[in-house]
């Protein structure tokens, strides 16, 4: 699925939208939940020194095959194999909606970041995961039948062009992510809710997603960097 270039939203629009939030290359970039490594490879082409981490040994092996010179490790998002304050950028692209321990994963992201570090996050938009369209028409109503404010697991089984992918994820309200970031010393710097661009449409039914965001992008900075700035300015 992810290795079929042009097959999913990553290739058609999602990567380019997300990269507008990512700062320029610095000391070290960590991709948490790197999968088979397509984002680390793109980041390397942009000049980033990247380490990729994923809990799936199968995906890590695929990443190593696709990028023999890359730095990939099989590890949990809640126990990252890096020293504290070793990265200046941590990316979690379409990862955090799939982890069971959200607070622990974000805490680990904060631990490995330097004081001036940045976290860039992409998730399934909580509005998207809470509900669904009633039908495939472009003007279909979008209905939230359950509670947006409750956390629950869900499964998406999708087949397209002969390729099948089963996603097992968790719906969480936006506040759950905000609170986890706050508890780990982050301040949200930017939030983006992109529409699908015209060139991203695969079919007429895709136009439904011009009214409801598919994804949520968040950039957060370490509160410690702000505290340091205040200390320097007073000295």
Question: Model-predicted segments: where are they?
Answer:
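Conserved class I S-adenosyl-L-methionine
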Residues: 1-25, 38-42, 59-62, 118-155
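Class I SAM-dependent methyltransferase SAM/SAH-binding core
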Residues: 30-32, 36-79
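A short acidic, Gly/Pro-enriched loop at the edge of an enzyme's catalytic core
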Residues: 78-89
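A short SAM/SAH-binding and catalytic strip from SAM-dependent methyltransferases
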Residues: 89-102
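A short glycine-rich, Lys/Arg-flanked "PGG" loop and its adjoining helix->strand segment in the class I
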Residues: 103-115
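Acceptor-substrate binding/catalytic loop of class I
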Residues: 127-130, 162-175
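Short alpha-helix
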Residues: 168-191
